[in-house]
Design a protein with these regions (language model features):
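Conserved catalytic core of the tyrosine transesterase superfamily
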Residues: 1-189
Length: 189
């Protein structure tokens, strides 16, 4: 048989779940402050793990945007939510200084020894704090934007996709949403 294997799509977290989770994340210790900043940023901007690991401090414009070097060394400037900006600012003011431990690094997110936080460690943080894979946050970001009415082309730009067909995997609308849109759009719906 010549069955084409379908790619399994990452889990999509509901907006109520992700909002509750981010709002209730512990925010006391240095690591908790760092982890909250990472998770807020990943959901805010749909970043890949590699993009988070390679972020530099100078790429963060206070509460406004973040410059990211994506796949194929493609640079893009992304808006960030106010909550992500606030979490990153808190991290930079206190937690990052403690983590840097008098070492000089321009990477934004640091590990407990003061060096660049690895992709493996970021995956572990997402799994521990959210209970899913990092790509699920990226997928959730794109899905929530599309469900909120964002144009596919805008989502493509935000995700850093060259090919629009890559972005189309995010257009799997829920059956409920499909029925709602049908009723709203069809003259006899």
């Amino acid at each position: 048989t010549n069955l084409k294997s379908e790619k399994k799509l990452p889990n999509i977290l509901s907006s109520s779940y992700i909002n509750k989770l981010l709002d209730e994340l512990p925010f006391q210790t240095t690591k908790e402050i760092r982890d909250k900043a990472i998770l807020e940023l990943m959901y805010s901007s749909g970043l890949r793990v590699s993009e988070v690991a390679n972020l530099k401090i100078q790429n963060f414009k206070l509460n406004k945007s973040i410059k990211v070097l994506g796949k194929g060394s493609k640079e893009r400037v992304l808006p960030i939510t106010a909550r992500a900006g606030k979490s990153i600012s808190s991290y930079l003011k206190v937690a990052r200084i403690e983590l840097a431990n008098n070492k000089s690094h321009d990477y934004m997110f640091l590990g407990i020894r003061g060096g660049q936080l690895s992709e493996r460690e970021i995956r572990r943080i997402v799994n521990l704090r959210v209970g899913t894979f990092p790509h699920s946050l990226r997928h959730t970001f794109a899905t929530h934007l599309l469900e909120g009415g964002a144009d596919l082309r805008v989502v493509q730009e935000l995700l850093g996709h060259n090919d629009p067909t890559t972005t189309q995997i995010y257009t799997h609308v829920s059956k409920k949403q499909l029925k709602e849109k049908f009723k709203q759009s069809h003259p006899r719906g």
